[in-house]
């Protein structure tokens, strides 16, 4: 299954409700419990400068893009065993598509 086309506004609401307590998206945004996500697309796992990643995250070696984020966001601990991201995931494909659409627009 491909990544469903997402709605940026719905994705923003999901980000605010489920992600913003640990992540920022703006250029120059600070790291919180999780890394700043600016420049996420096209970056390899564990590469945000100044953030202390687990070895598992650094070693995963995939590049963040629509399809890898779609799989990761369903169940982060299954996709990267040993990640410190304490998020159960988004089980609904349309919600993951919405969040990815928002992240693509907000992290450029």
Swiss-Prot record:
Pfam families assigned to the protein according to its UniProt record, in alphabetical order: Cytochrom_C (PF00034)
Recorded GO CC terms: mitochondrial intermembrane space
Post-translational modification: Binds 1 heme c group covalently per subunit.
Keyword ATP-binding recorded: no
Record InterPro entries: Cyt_c-like_dom (IPR009056), Cyt_c-like_dom_sf (IPR036909), Cyt_c_1A/1B (IPR002327)
Described purpose of this protein according to its UniProt entry: Electron carrier protein. The oxidized form of the cytochrome c heme group can accept an electron from the heme group of the cytochrome c1 subunit of cytochrome reductase. Cytochrome c then transfers this electron to the cytochrome oxidase complex, the final protein carrier in the mitochondrial electron-transport chain.
The protein's name: Cytochrome c
Organism phylogeny: Eukaryota, Metazoa, Ecdysozoa, Arthropoda, Hexapoda
């Amino acid at each position: 299954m491909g990544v469903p086309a997402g709605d940026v506004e719905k994705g923003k609401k999901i980000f605010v409700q489920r992600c913003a307590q640990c992540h920022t998206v703006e250029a120059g945004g600070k790291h919180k419990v999780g890394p700043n996500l600016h420049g996420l697309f096209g970056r390899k796992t564990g590469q945000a400068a100044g953030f202390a990643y687990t070895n598992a995250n650094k070693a995963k070696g995939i590049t963040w893009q629509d399809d890898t984020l779609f799989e990761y966001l369903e169940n982060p601990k299954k996709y990267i065993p040993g990640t410190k991201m304490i998020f159960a995931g988004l089980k609904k494909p349309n919600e993951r598509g919405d969040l990815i659409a928002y992240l693509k627009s907000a992290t450029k």
